[in-house]
Amino acid sequence: MEFRTIKEDGQIQEEIKKSRFICHAKRVYSEEEARAFINAIKKEHYKATHNCSAFIVGEHSEIKRTSDDGEPSGTAGVPMLGVLENHNLTNVCVVVTRYFGGIKLGAGGLIRAYAGSVALAVKEIGIVEIKEQAGVQIQMSYAQYQEYGNFLKEHNLVELETNFTDQVDTIIFVDKEVKEDTKAALIEFFNGKVILTDQGLREVEVPVYLV
């Protein structure tokens, strides 16, 4: 199992030509869950002019749905979906609430506003890649731990669990196909003076940094 989705649920708000746009984003794992979220937002913002939506569900993005909710056809839901697709996201639902401010945006303006709202939300909330990785427990001295950060930075890794006793025990998770190479690199980095123990597999969320 491996897919990209948003880091967490969240929302952002911006004003465009006196209209207020609020993008609500949520992780969902079924069409039913997505529609329940959309309905909840519509209920919360029942006075809004529009509550447009888009969602993608499935490890392989099998289900895709959009709604313009009264905006001109193709100016809201599809552009919103396009942002999710461009970031290769799935298991996510976005609803953009619009409170009309009196100035019409035109078709092009609406497309930019709705897509831009979702793009801003994705950027602010962040993206993670959910995957199965292999765990490696590392036992080292406190002196070695002082240098350990350099290894993590060099290999773009993050320590997930660390215990401090008379020594330092920490766990990292790496892609399965590079586990043995990572262990070899650790042994070389510490000149062979380190104890490594395989910890099996687990599902982890790896941050994806947008350029």
Segments the model singles out, each with a brief description of its role:
Residues 126-143:
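Short glycine-/aliphatic-rich beta-strand segments at the starts of folded cytosolic domains
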Residues 139-157:
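Short amphipathic alpha-helix segments
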Residues 45-48, 155-160, 187-195:
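A common structural junction motif
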Residues 1-74, 179, 195-206, 211:
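C-terminal regulatory domains involved in ligand/effector binding and gene-expression control
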Residues 172-178:
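Terminal, non-globular segments
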Residues 34-37, 114, 148-151, 182-185:
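Hydrophobic side chains in well-ordered alpha-helices
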Residues 76-124:
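Active-site beta-strand/loop microenvironment that shapes enzyme catalytic pockets
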Residues 42, 84-85, 115, 119-126, ...:
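Signal for well-folded cores of large energy- and translation-related assemblies
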